[in-house]
């Protein structure tokens, strides 16, 4: 089981490091295809959110291949980011993916968005041909585990997300949100979720600016808000008390000089910026201005901590589910590992049987139909008796971690390695590329 994971997340790296690794949604298909075609990597997927960027893959040379890919994709030396990177392999890689999909590794434990984000990453990987059988099995099982965690525990009983935490932080700043106005820059799922929370907490007016105006109009209609063309952003954003931004832009769209103009037009009435984008939309220097308060994705952790104690018991229950599911998944993979050996053994012994029947015909001449049937039944019976013990042993061994040793032993006894070499000579080497 050669699964490997490498990445950075909110636990290991601050936002200024995570934004260095962030991959825009528009580039994700290209990056995923590059991952799967990198030498040594057999199949792979990339998850890129505001809180994590990680690659999961099956690899010949382990995380050496993954680090090589990081160097190629980002034009960096991974050693420079050693203190921020985490790596998992084999069982721990499986456990990590189950925990991520189940929201046990999220900034807000139990938040529902991460499962959708992992599913989108998986869909992208499938679309570009980067997923083959084993990674497909891993992700399919991860989604099932996530569903079981949400069904069998109360980990998601109180709806918590980055968006809801952002709104809670706004309430801490302003007290009540009644009569306040909010300007949302971006029209993604997180922005829409935040808008719902703002409306539920009494916000009076919502403005929406998006790169695609039509999408902004559709977004604003859902909340009886007002869509603003993106080219009018800087002259209209100071209408609002609260600005929530999540655009996916490669550089900050709000800088200190913008803030100075906003405060001047507002006659120094304060503005609150909630920046949930990675890379960040708001330059940190904006915080130097009196009257402007900027909170980025890492600042939200201060609010998140208030939710942690409520969920500890449920998280422990969820962790137990994940651990049990990891064992089941590994046993299933080991079972799949023995199937090719069983098939090779059956084919090998059938070849021997047919060769011996042909040799018998050469010695005895033409056989009658009745004799043919008798010889066929006799030889099949002998072969089945010969195969019974090794096949039973293989199936039993598949349930144990040491199954590889038994598989190798059976291959040696029946000379199946040489048979595989002969097949390779006849058919040629396997083709390289994604999903190979």
Swiss-Prot record:
- The answer to whether UniProt assigns keyword Oxidoreductase to this entry is yes
Pathway assigned in UniProt: Porphyrin-containing compound metabolism; protoporphyrin-IX biosynthesis; 5-aminolevulinate from L-glutamyl-tRNA(Glu): step 1/2
> Could you tell me the EC number(s) of this protein?
1.2.1.70
GO molecular function (one): NADP binding
The UniProt keywords, alphabetically, are: NADP, Oxidoreductase, Porphyrin biosynthesis
Out of the domains of life, which is the source? Bacteria
Q: Sorted alphabetically, which InterPro entries does this protein's record hold?
A: 4pyrrol_synth_GluRdtase, 4pyrrol_synth_GluRdtase_dimer, 4pyrrol_synth_GluRdtase_N, GluRdtase_CS, GluRdtase_dimer_dom_sf, GluRdtase_N_sf, NAD(P)-bd_dom_sf, Shikm_DH/Glu-tRNA_Rdtase
Binding residue positions for substrate? 49-52, 106, 111-113, 117
One of its GO biological process terms is: protoporphyrinogen IX biosynthetic process from glutamate
Q: How does the entry describe the domains?
A: Possesses an unusual extended V-shaped dimeric structure with each monomer consisting of three distinct domains arranged along a curved 'spinal' alpha-helix. The N-terminal catalytic domain specifically recognizes the glutamate moiety of the substrate. The second domain is the NADPH-binding domain, and the third C-terminal domain is responsible for dimerization.
Q: Which NCBIfam families match?
A: hemA (TIGR01035)
Q: How does it assemble?
A: Homodimer.
Q: Which PANTHER family match?
A: GLUTAMYL-TRNA REDUCTASE
The entry's protein name is Glutamyl-tRNA reductase 2
Which organism is this protein's natural source? Answer: Koribacter versatilis (strain Ellin345)
Organism lineage: Bacteria, Pseudomonadati, Acidobacteriota, Terriglobia, Terriglobales
Name of the gene? hemA2
